[in-house]
C-alpha cells in the first residue's frame, strides 16, 4: 500500500484536532465591546504531507467545522504514522453556517492562499472581517496531537484617531462616517510560507464603502482622541511593512460628503 506520493504507507491513525481562536486583542467596536473574535464562525483545516524536495503536498481534502465558543473541533482526521505533516488552519466569518464552504470576505478556493473577496466591496470598521490562522508541524507523526492549537491574526490592525473632533462646534459638520482607499496594501496571504499577495500593477488598489465611525472608542494613548476607523491588513509576521497611498474621506450620517479635506 502506498500514499499518493508513492511512499510506503505507515499505520493509519484517526485523531481529533481542535483549534481555538485567541481571545482578546485591540478594541474594535466600542470600549465596552472589544474585538474578541466573537464574529468568527467557520474554521478550515488543511493537512499537508511534507514530501522532501516537493515541499508540503495536500493530504486528503479540506475539512470545515463551525466555530462554537471560539473553538472548532475536527473529528476523524486520518494520518499515517512516520510521516511529517503541516496542519494549516484558517478561521473567519461566513454569512451562514449551513454551508461552511461558501466564502464571505475572504476567498479560500486556492487554499492555503487566502485573498480578499473581490465580489464584496471592502468596508472599514467591520468586525466580521476579523480572521485567524495557524500553521503547525507534526514531525515523524507517532499518533499523538496537541489537545488544542491556538490561532492568531494574520493582520496588522490600522487604527486611525482624530485629536481635534471636539473643536468642530456644529454636530452637523462632525463626521459620522468615513471611506478608506488604499493603493498598496496586500490583498492576500499564503498561509504556509507567509508570503503576501501584492496588488496588481495599475489595479487601482482597494476602495471601501462608506462605513460608520466606531462607537465611543477613545485612544488608549492620547486623552480625548476619537477613533475614526480600524482596518485589518495582511502583514508579515515579525516584520514591519510600510503602507502608503491611504486616503480617508468624511461623510455625515446620510452619506453626504462633508467639506473636510480628505486625509
Map each language-model feature to its residues:
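A short mid-domain helix/strand-loop element embedded in enzyme catalytic domains
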Residues: 141-142, 150-152, 179-183
Amino acid at each position: 500500500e502506498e500514499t499518493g506520493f508513492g511512499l510506503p504507507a505507515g499505520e493509519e491513525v484517526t485523531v481529533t484536532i481542535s483549534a481555538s481562536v485567541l481571545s482578546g486583542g485591540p478594541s474594535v467596536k466600542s470600549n465596552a465591546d472589544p474585538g474578541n473574535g466573537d464574529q468568527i464562525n467557520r474554521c478550515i483545516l488543511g493537512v499537508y504531507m511534507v514530501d522532501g524536495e516537493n515541499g508540503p503536498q495536500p493530504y486528503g481534502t479540506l475539512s470545515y467545522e463551525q466555530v462554537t465558543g471560539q473553538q472548532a473541533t475536527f473529528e476523524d482526521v486520518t494520518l499515517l504514522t512516520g510521516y511529517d505533516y503541516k496542519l494549516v488552519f484558517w478561521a473567519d466569518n461566513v454569512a451562514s453556517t449551513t454551508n461552511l464552504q461558501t466564502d464571505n470576505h475572504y476567498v479560500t478556493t486556492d487554499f492555503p492562499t487566502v485573498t480578499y473577496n473581490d465580489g464584496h466591496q471592502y468596508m472599514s470598521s467591520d468586525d466580521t472581517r476579523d480572521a485567524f490562522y495557524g500553521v503547525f508541524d507534526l514531525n515523524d507523526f507517532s499518533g499523538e496531537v496537541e489537545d488544542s492549537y491556538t490561532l492568531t491574526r494574520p493582520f496588522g490592525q490600522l487604527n486611525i484617531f482624530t485629536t481635534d473632533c471636539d473643536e468642530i462646534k456644529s454636530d452637523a459638520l462632525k463626521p459620522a462616517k468615513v471611506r478608506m482607499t488604499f493603493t498598496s496594501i496586500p490583498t492576500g496571504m499564503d498561509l504556509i510560507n507567509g508570503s503576501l499577495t501584492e496588488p496588481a500593477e495599475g489595479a487601482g488598489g482597494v476602495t471601501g464603502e462608506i462605513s460608520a465611525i466606531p462607537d465611543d472608542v477613545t485612544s488608549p494613548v492620547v486623552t480625548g482622541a476619537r477613533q475614526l476607523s480600524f482596518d485589518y491588513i495582511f502583514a508579515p509576521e515579525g516584520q514591519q511593512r510600510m503602507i502608503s497611498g491611504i486616503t480617508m474621506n468624511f461623510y455625515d450620517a446620510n452619506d453626504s460628503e462633508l467639506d473636510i479635506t480628505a486625509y
